[in-house]
């Protein structure tokens, strides 16, 4: 790993939150130091990037002879997307869903065709939805339908601020509509589940804290990687449940073209984005609970993850433009359900 006093001083702020609108690349850089990067990502990726970024920095120095500072910002994917549009100077954005990248594209920050710039359609991680339950799973929650049973209290993040919450929503909807049910039946089921949600944390990590640290709810819907991390940390006493019918959660990475053009750091931004698909980075993602997209790595670690019999994805809903228009736009299905809940 990159280390040493000089690099430690240079990267003293690396990993800290960057305030919206702050230009971390202003001013000149000394000899032997490259222009810094800002990576903006969603909340639950921090543990992976804490391990991946130092390895990339070491590889960059070995290749170029220059130190590279990388600052980071984490939060709910929808909130991070809005922050970038409003002025957060991201050079690389690793978000929870392609729909958020499309918003950056619509805002003129990302060039069209970003899906073709990197391997695997610019997707760097996969995951699925997991259910975390209380010790012994006293409510017997094993499948999606169990969430609508009387007496089952559900915790999930807010789809307006959290990408993971949108995936949870699609998982709920698809568990009916992608297994032979009608759209009307799916809406009734999703409505029944959300009536059991007492509060909506702003992101997936806060949802985990609400369930595990504050003791709220009978079951938490969250990323599988969050469940794996909670198990490793000894915070989850009962094995989590991965429903056999599930949604493929795809996390993209993108270079924020307008920002890197202004900052003059495109080579480093492109190198970082590509590195995230490398075997080395994908192994770390797998160790942190994500399902890797690198074929060889996935073949080697597949047995660590619960099998899923029926796996649908965003494309089965018509893609993220259609998903946002149908479910999450102003006045769309989510707003209707939320109004009913209130």
Predicted region positions:
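Sec-dependent N-terminal signal peptides
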Residues: 1-7
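C-terminal motif of bacterial Sec signal peptides marking the signal peptidase cleavage site
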Residues: 9-13
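Extracellular/periplasmic juxtamembrane helices and adjacent flexible linkers that interface
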Residues: 14-17, 260-342
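N-terminal segment of the mature folded domain
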Residues: 17-161, 303, 342
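Short beta-strand->loop
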Residues: 40-42, 133-134, 153-179, 193-197, ...
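Sec-exported extracytoplasmic/periplasmic mature domains
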Residues: 54-62, 85-89, 98, 105-109, ...
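Short helix-loop capping/hinge motifs at secondary-structure junctions, enriched
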Residues: 136-142, 161, 174-182, 259-269
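Ligand-binding pocket segment of bilobal, Venus flytrap-like solute-binding proteins
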Residues: 179-245, 252
